[in-house]
Amino acid sequence: MGSAWKWTKMITVGAVVCVGGPMFVNYVRPTEEELFQRFNPELQKRNLANRDKRQQEFDEFVTKLKEYSKSDKPIWVVAKEAEELQKKQQREAALAAKKAAAETPTDKPTQ
């Protein structure tokens, strides 16, 4: 009889913890709107002003991840390769701009 009581007690406690824990977390955790309302007005304005930019950056990030996932390589390897390629292109563009600036004659009036 003692063994059955222990099993029943442990199963009951386990169920309460497994079900009650997440329910308690959901009850205590504020919603996104409640958090936004707690911001001071200046932060609310700044958040609203930057919302479109952040959403666009997130969409670009997800698009890049989708492109990277098409490769057979792990995503972090493909992302690093893409980052290195982008840096190389930026260096080449900067070098080309430097050369173009050096080749362009500057017309300075002589006095």
Curated annotation (Swiss-Prot):
InterPro entries: Cbp4. Its main location: mitochondrion. Belongs to the CBP4 family. This is Assembly factor CBP4. It comes from Coccidioides immitis (strain RS) (Valley fever fungus). It comes from the Eukaryota. One of its GO terms (cellular component) is mitochondrial inner membrane. Residues 79-104 form a coiled coil. GO terms for biological process: mitochondrial respiratory chain complex III assembly. The lineage of its organism: Eukaryota, Fungi, Dikarya, Ascomycota, Pezizomycotina. Essential for the assembly of ubiquinol-cytochrome c reductase. It has a direct effect on the correct occurrence of the Rieske protein, core 4, core 5 and apocytochrome b. Residues 92-103 have a biased composition (Low complexity). The chain crosses the membrane at residues 10-28. The keyword DNA damage does not apply. Keywords: Chaperone, Coiled coil, Membrane, Mitochondrion, Mitochondrion inner membrane, Transmembrane, Transmembrane helix. It is a single-pass membrane protein. Residues 89-111 are annotated as: Disordered. It is found in: Mitochondrion inner membrane. Pfam families: CBP4.
